[in-house]
A protein has these predicted regions:
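N-terminal capping segments
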Residues: 208-285
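Glycine-rich, aromatic-bearing surface loops/beta-hairpins
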Residues: 130-135, 142-157, 339-370
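A short hydrophobic beta-strand element
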Residues: 97-121, 125
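N-terminal Sec-pathway targeting helices
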Residues: 2-19, 29-32
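Short, non-transmembrane alpha-helical segments in secretory-pathway proteins
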Residues: 42, 47-82, 224-231
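Non-catalytic propeptide/linker segments at domain boundaries
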Residues: 128-224
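...with weaker cross-activation on analogous glycine-rich loops/strands in unrelated enzymes
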Residues: 100-108, 282-346
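Glycine-rich catalytic cores of cysteine/serine-nucleophile enzymes that process amide/ester linkages
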Residues: 245-253, 276-282, 325-362
Length: 370
């Protein structure tokens, strides 16, 4: 009888052990799938149900971009992974002669700062708050920005970029120049390099001083809801300019859909339509860029109604938007740790792509007045 009990006990132990191994295996598979979802950056290829595979490890291209990203970001970030994809621009005017190649590059990085109060921008804000001692609104906006920035400390961030590599000799990466190829007007990729500490401190100081000097009525706006919408309804297509399958089918689509998309994001954040700003209206679908002084649109409307106001690069909150003046184009801000801004957009479709440091003659940085 004792032997039977012993055998039964051993059998039960064996079954439990096998079950445990299955559970461990399932969790490992899930973690791999989940990690892949996190790093794919919303990529979409010709097959909408598949994600393109990155180039093989230790290729010339990958090693080149690992070194390039280290040069750009190593002062402020730990670069944890770099994924390099071939990129095919959807532009009939581009001729391929071997003198240049295009790449889509996803990087996984993490801020080196252990505390939000170590960020140069925050140091600058604190200096301004101390100078404006007793002004409650200065302290309020300081605390709000601190709360926003805390979520970036210690957590990996995914950043996407589209680069054009220009070779001095065909396919020779030595001495090759890298340009940002996000849109038609290409600029040096070195403009992605973060500002110096002193410049970010100055931005932090100026952010508080400017806000207090131009205080506006506080609006109700859900930044998180707006960002979630922006992430849901765009992607990073590798073989075409846009993937309308992921767009919100409830809205009319436009050949130049950038302002339409940003307006949708702002609406998702809780800003209600009016008799002037509503789907398909002029103010909803036009950028309102200063490039066209006599034509109003989204940018002019949001400023006139004091819903958004101009700020600097580091002071821009996720949930804000950027107007590119020369291109008459708008994009929606989905992340800003005060060092690097990421944006989403339509025409062309972009998701979590880094924005270069453009000056006030090139871009307007608009943040919500909440």
């Amino acid at each position: 009888m004792k032997k039977k009990k012993k055998k039964g006990h051993l059998k039960l132990t064996f079954i439990l052990f096998i079950a445990f191994l299955w559970i461990v295996a399932v969790f490992q598979i899930y973690s791999v799938i989940n990690k892949h979802k996190k790093i794919d950056g919303g990529l979409s290829g010709d097959d909408e149900n598949s994600t393109p595979s990155p180039l093989k490890r230790n290729t010339t291209e990958e090693l080149f971009f690992i070194n390039f990203m280290q040069d750009l970001y190593s002062e402020h970030y730990d670069i944890q992974n770099v994924y390099v994809y071939d990129y095919i621009p959807d532009d009939e005017d581009i001729e391929y002669d071997g003198s240049s190649k295009y790449y889509f590059v996803t990087i996984e990085k993490k801020l080196k700062y252990g505390s939000v109060f170590q960020l140069p921008f925050v140091i600058g804000m604190e200096q301004a708050v101390n100078k404006l001692n007793g002004i409650k609104e200065a302290k309020r906006i300081y605390n709000k920005r601190i709360t926003e920035l805390k979520k970036y400390i210690g957590l990996p961030q995914i950043e996407n970029n589209i680069f054009k590599v220009v070779f001095s000799e065909e396919n020779n990466f030595e001495n090759a120049k890298v340009k940002i190829a996000t849109y038609h007007s290409e600029i040096s990729a070195m403009r992605l390099k973060p500002l110096s500490d002193s410049e970010m401190i100055k931005d932090g100081y100026g952010f508080i001083i400017s806000y207090v000097s131009n205080m506006r009525d506080k609006i109700e706006y859900d930044n998180t809801a707006a960002v979630k919408y922006a992430d849901k309804y765009t992607s990073n297509p590798l073989n075409k300019a846009k993937n309308e399958n992921v767009w919100n089918q409830k809205y009319k689509k436009y050949e130049n859909d950038c302002a339409n998309f940003v307006s949708q994001c702002i609406y998702a954040g809780g800003i209600r339509p009016t008799k002037t700003w509503f789907p398909e209206s002029f103010y909803w679908i036009r950028t309102g860029s200063p490039k066209y002084h006599d034509i109003s649109g989204l940018t002019t409307y949001m400023q006139k109604k004091n819903i958004f106001s101009q700020t600097n690069y580091s002071g821009l909150s996720a949930g804000g938007f950027i107007c590119l003046i020369k291109e008459s184009h708008v994009v929606f801000v989905t992340s800003n740790d005060s060092i690097t801004v990421l944006f989403n957009g339509h025409t062309n479709d972009r998701k979590r792509v880094s924005f270069p440091h453009l000056n006030e003659s090139e871009a307007m940085y608009l943040t919500p007045n909440n």
